[in-house]
Structures are given as C-alpha cells and as structure tokens.
C-alpha cells in the first residue's frame, strides 16, 4: 500500500564510488562533481554503467568530473530506439558521455510499425504540479497543461504546458502565462482534425478573472487574453473548438445583480476574442447559474448547458450559437419538486452535430443517470434513464461521458460501495446493459473515471483509488477487461486526465507524489498500432 510519507529508495552512489569521488564524510567534495541528467521520450528506458541512472525512475546523478559514463537505451514493448540528442548523438542504443562538465542527454523511442502499447511513465513537470488536462488530435499529437507552484516557498501557481509529437515525444515544458495570481479551474478543448486548441482558466487578480490562450500546431501557443473585465468573480469555464479552429468559451461569473450568471465569448482563429455576452436572462436574486458545459457544432455553432439552482431546487438550461448570434435560453431538464434533485452533468457532440446530455439525478431514495439526445438543433422531450437506479441516501454520481465522431456514446458512473459501471449507446439508440468496470472493494475510487472512446467503440477508463494506485480498464469487442494498476510509483497517484482519438491512440497524465520532492505530472502515451 502506498503512503504519502513513504521514502523512495536512495539512489545508488556507484557512479561516485566507482570513481573514488565520495568524500570522507559521506558527501561530495565541492568542485569535483558534475550532474548527468537523462530524459526519455517515448516508450523506453536508459541505464548507466557504472550504475546510478535508471531512467524513467532515477534520471539524474552526481558524477565525478573526468569520468566516462556508458549509457544504454532499451525500448519498451512495441517501441524501437530512435536517436540520442544532447551530449549523445546517433541512432545506436549505446552512448559514452565524457563528464568533464554537467551534461544533458535525451533518448527518443518511437512505436514500432504496426505495434501497439503504452509508453513508459515519464515525469513531465517539475515538483509542485497538479490538475493536469490533456487532449489528442487525429494525428496522435497531444497537449498537456497543468498548474505548477512558482517556487518551493510560495503558494502561487502558474499555468504550464507541453506538446507531444509522435516520433519526437514531449517538448520541454513551458510556462503559458505571466500573470501574478494563482491558477485554477482549467479546461482544455481541441478540434481533433486540425489539432487547434484553446485552454481556459481562472486566475486570481483583484478578483477571479477568466483567461484563454489558443494553440495552433504550426505556430504554437498564441497570446494569453483576459476574457472579461466585469469586476465580478469568475467561477468555472468550458471551451469547445470547431473544425475551423474557432472557439466558444462559456463561464459563470458574478454579474451586476450579485449572482452567478452565464457569459460567453467567441474566438476567431488567428483573430480576436469578442466581448462577453450574457446568454441567459434569469438574473433573479438567490438563484445561481453555474457549471456551464459547451460543445462545438459543425459550421461554427455551439451548444451550452448549465445548471440553475436556488439551494433547494435545480434544473438544467441550454442556449445555442448558430454561427452568428446566440438564441434564447430555455429549460432542458425541469425540476420536479422536493423529491428530486439534479446533480452534475456532461455534454458531448458528434461530427454531425448530434449530441447527448447526461446528468445525475436523485429521486426520493434512488439515484440514477439520465440522458437526453440533441438532433437537428432540438433536444428530445422526454428524459431516459441510462440504467436502473441504485438505492441510495442523498448520494449521486458525477457522470463521465465520451462520444466518437459517428455518435456512439459511452458513459461511466459509480455507486457508494465503490462499484464503477459503464454503458454504451450506438448513434440514436438506447444505452445497453450496464457493465461493471470495477467491483466493490475496501479500496474506493477517489473520483469518477476519466474515459475515452475510439471509432470502433473500444474504450479506456482510468481512475485513482484510496490505496494510492492508478488503475486502467479497457473495453474491446464489447467487453471490459479486469482493471490493472497503471503506474509503478511508490507514492500516491491522483487526478488522472485521459483523451483518446478515433484511431484508439490515447494520452494519459496524472499527479504523482514523489517522496522528498512533492507532486509532479507524469504522462504515458498509447499507440493503437492502427
């Protein structure tokens, strides 16, 4: 079992001992050592002779000046060694590094032709990182963003990011904004075909402000832009990117009537952001509108769903952008009175603009997931249960929802004993019989799984548990396999983020506690071989 306070094994001192570099007091003599740092890109590992480097676990060591260190690159299953860079060069797996100064070496691995499998887990960030978000495009290129402490002595966080390119691996992490306040409530959206993306976040200034930053595969990251200057605190936001690279961002913010209202802004690819627009007219004191979710439509439109609550009642509302203007807000799921309460919701659209809304709902002493479909710009009138309800006392699951471009949907949820369920629905059809992805046990999931779905309805689900482990379950040929641990670290793993493209390639990031250092963002990449 993992423990927060558990210590990692102390790295071998063989690199020093073999060269007589250890000082008599057990330390190192000042000026006699240099640092060897190794990075691994893709699926593989690197070891050294003398011992000390074993990367991806131990990727740096102090080495006596003047020593020649031999490095050996070994690909993981389904990968081949590609090349060295930095203080090593060439395409053969062995390399000798002359340590007459501190050196950096990178070993790159690429998927073997037609091979499938996961890359080794890799530490992507420095310490003090958390809240990762990931997306992957049709070509297998991925983005990861996360928050990271500015230093070990501050609580202020900044937004960082890295890009994955097949055959090249992850880029060096870079800070994505230069504002003074801490970052929270990140969302990351991408158009799979073009790879264009936008990240949005909340940042503490005089109050909480909303920010956004676009990404283009050819040009890289654009400028960070403040979305609003209304003075009221911003809460949560959501972003969707269409096939032209244009984006719709929606967020909740305290408006002129001192209540949370729903605002939107549009981004034109290569251009500017529009001024915020209030897209609902509730504005009743004591009633709050929040948790907006947005999905892009073909042709430049977008659909938004949010939750309206007064503390004892809740309903779901919607509005749509038609490519030139917003419509009128309308109730899509009504509150049925004191015996019902509506929880969190999820929204997805396919390539033709047909979509699905899924939400958790408590009715008397039962909880269940419900859904409505969106087709030809209209929401279906009657809500339908995903599966039979579960007896529960005041507990509802947050739903996870994925949809592929053809309209097949996958949803996942949990019940209080720790069981995780999933169900799929073909385009326009009802959900099938729920499947148990994970059974009840003493170690409980700490969150609802993150899920991905490809064009063949193969799927992945990843979650963290109270024992500190990260688990993966996969669906193939209509059946879920048994969950397996998906990281080999000693300490606690949490906050998984997963995305999967139509070909079944996937990217996974999570927050990993590292004893003696703090929390880092770790990543793995999956190649489907297609």
Predicted features, each with a name:
Residues 1-8:
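Bacterial N-terminal signal peptides that target proteins for export
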Residues 37-56, 90, 123, 127, ...:
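Short, solvent-exposed loop/edge segments of extracellular or virion-exposed proteins
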Residues 20-23:
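Bacterial signal peptide processing site
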Residues 112-530:
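Extracellular, repeat-based ectodomains that mediate carbohydrate processing or recognition
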Residues 49-78, 99-101:
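Extracellular modular ligand-binding repeats in secreted and cell-surface proteins
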Residues 15-18:
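C-terminal motif of bacterial Sec signal peptides marking the signal peptidase cleavage site
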Residues 30-39, 63, 94-113:
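Conserved "repeat-terminator" motif of extracellular CCP/Sushi domains
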Residues 41, 45, 67-93:
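Surface-exposed interfaces of beta-sheet-rich extracellular modules
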């Amino acid at each position: 079992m993992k423990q927060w306070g558990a210590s990692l094994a102390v790295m071998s001192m063989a690199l020093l001992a073999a060269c007589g570099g250890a000082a008599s007091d057990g330390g190192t003599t000042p000026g006699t050592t240099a640092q060897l740092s190794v990075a691994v890109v893709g699926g593989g590992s690197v070891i050294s002779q003398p011992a000390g480097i074993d990367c991806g676990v131990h990727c740096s060591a102090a080495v006596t000046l003047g020593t020649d260190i031999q490095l050996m690159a070994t690909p993981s299953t389904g990968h081949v060694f590609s090349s060295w860079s930095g203080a090593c060069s060439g395409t053969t797996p062995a390399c000798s590094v002359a340590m007459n100064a501190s050196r950096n070496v990178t070993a790159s691995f690429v998927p073997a032709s037609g091979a499938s499998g996961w890359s080794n887990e890799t530490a992507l960030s420095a310490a003090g990182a958390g809240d990762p978000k990931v997306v992957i495009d049709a070509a297998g290129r991925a983005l990861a963003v996360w928050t990271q402490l500015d230093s070990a002595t501050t609580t202020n966080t900044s937004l960082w990011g890295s890009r994955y390119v097949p055959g090249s691996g992850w880029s060096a992490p870079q800070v994505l904004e230069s504002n003074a306040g801490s970052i929270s409530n990140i969302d990351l959206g991408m158009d799979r075909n073009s790879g264009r993306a936008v990240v949005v976040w909340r940042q503490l200034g005089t109050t909480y402000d909303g920010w956004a930053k676009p990404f283009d595969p050819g040009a890289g990251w654009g400028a960070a832009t403040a979305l609003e200057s209304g003075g009221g605190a911003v809460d949560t936001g959501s972003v969707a990117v269409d096939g032209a690279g244009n984006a719709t961002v929606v967020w909740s913010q305290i408006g002129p009537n001192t209540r949370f209202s729903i605002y939107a802004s549009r981004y034109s690819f290569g251009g500017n952001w529009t001024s915020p627009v209030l897209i609902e007219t509730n504005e009743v004191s004591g009633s709050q509108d929040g948790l907006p979710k947005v999905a892009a439509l073909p042709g430049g439109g977008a659909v938004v769903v949010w939750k309206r609550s007064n503390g004892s009642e809740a309903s779901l509302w919607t509005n749509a952008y038609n490519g030139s203007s917003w419509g009128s807000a309308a109730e899509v799921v009504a509150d049925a009175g004191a015996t019902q309460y509506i929880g969190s919701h999820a929204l997805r659209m396919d390539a033709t603009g047909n979509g699905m809304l899924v939400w958790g709902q408590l009715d008397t002493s039962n909880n269940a997931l419900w859904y409505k479909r969106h087709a030809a710009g209209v929401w279906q009138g009657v809500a339908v249960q995903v599966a039979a309800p579960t007896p529960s006392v005041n507990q509802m699951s947050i739903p996870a929802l994925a949809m592929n471009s053809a309209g097949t949907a996958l949803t996942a949820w949990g019940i209080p004993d720790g069981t995780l369920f999933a169900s799929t629905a073909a385009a326009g059809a009802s959900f099938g019989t729920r499947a148990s992805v994970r059974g009840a046990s003493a170690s409980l999931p700490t969150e609802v799984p993150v899920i991905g779905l490809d064009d063949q309805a193969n799927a992945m689900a990843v979650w963290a548990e109270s024992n500190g482990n990260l688990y993966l379950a996969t669906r193939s040929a209509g059946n879920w396999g048994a969950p397996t641990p998906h990281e080999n670290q000693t300490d606690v793993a949490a906050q998984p983020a997963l995305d999967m493209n139509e070909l079944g390639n996937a990217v996974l990031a999570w927050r990993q506690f590292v004893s003696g250092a703090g929390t880092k963002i770790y990543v793995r990449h999956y190649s489907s071989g297609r």
